[in-house]
């Protein structure tokens, strides 16, 4: 079985193949999300604590959280479920998924380091991979750099260097477009939008008042016409 070990603190991961089933016995019958000590896996993992995050069986079917079985099942999946991406709105599909209990039929078991042990694992805990992209939303940039509302967020955007594929061209930097950035222009647009809304509401009120007056006038005219007809009919009956 292969162990795909990730270390989220450093952003690294490493695939380790283990042939001895006795070293893997500690993971058997465990469920996804459970924490397992790594002392029995090998001397290099002494003191480490792993969390089981997933895995695949030998045919490539992924483990599904919540299915308390050590074998494969067919589930009706919809949008929002793991292991399925719908192609249309409201589409559902029955797909084969592996239960969340670890067994011998797994080809790869995904683990995350929860607690680091005594010695470093080469290529995993002794290396740090920096994040490729920084925060994009204005509030998250403020939180990341501990800025106040008075500070200009645009000065703190993390730029990344792009190396062009063509030879002889200089590398250049790219920055993401800041989302939800409050500027004088956006405030002006907001004021303009509210002014249009207010103007439209006033216009609707005036038109409604005019229509009510017109309806009252028409009702009064119809009532007057009825009274005239009634009076004419009464006078003709007297004759």
Curated annotation (Swiss-Prot):
Keyword list, A-Z: Cytoplasm, Phosphoprotein, Ribonucleoprotein, Ribosomal protein
Cystine bridges: none
Pfam families: Ribosomal_S6e (PF01092)
GO biological process, one term: cytoplasmic translation
SMART domains: Ribosomal_S6e
Highest taxon of source: Eukaryota
Family: Belongs to the eukaryotic ribosomal protein eS6 family.
Protein name, as recorded: Small ribosomal subunit protein eS6B
Organism: Schizosaccharomyces pombe (strain 972 / ATCC 24843) (Fission yeast)
């Amino acid at each position: 079985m292969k162990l795909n070990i990730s270390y989220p603190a450093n952003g690294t991961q490493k695939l380790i193949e283990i042939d001895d089933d006795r070293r893997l016995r500690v993971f058997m019958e465990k469920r996804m999300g459970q924490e397992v000590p790594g002392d029995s896996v090998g001397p290099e993992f002494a003191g480490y604590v792993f969390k089981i995050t997933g895995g695949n069986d030998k045919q490539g079917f992924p483990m599904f959280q919540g299915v308390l079985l050590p074998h494969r099942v067919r589930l009706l999946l919809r949008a929002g479920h793991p292991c399925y991406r719908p192609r249309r709105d409201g589409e559902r599909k029955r797909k084969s998924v592996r239960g969340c209990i670890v067994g011998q039929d797994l080809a790869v078991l995904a683990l995350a380091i929860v607690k680091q042990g005594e010695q470093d694992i080469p290529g995993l805990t002794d290396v740090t991979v920096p994040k490729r992209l920084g925060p994009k939303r204005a509030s998250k940039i403020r939180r990341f750099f501990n800025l106040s509302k008075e500070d200009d967020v645009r000065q703190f955007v993390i730029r990344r260097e792009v190396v062009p594929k063509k030879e002889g061209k200089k590398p250049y930097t790219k920055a993401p477009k800041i989302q939800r950035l409050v500027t004088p222009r956006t405030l002006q647009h907001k004021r303009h939008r509210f002014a249009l809304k207010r103007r439209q509401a006033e216009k609707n009120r005036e038109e409604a008042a005019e229509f009510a007056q017109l309806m009252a006038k028409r009702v009064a005219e119809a009532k007057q016409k009825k009274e005239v007809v009634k009076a004419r009919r009464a006078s003709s009956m007297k004759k």
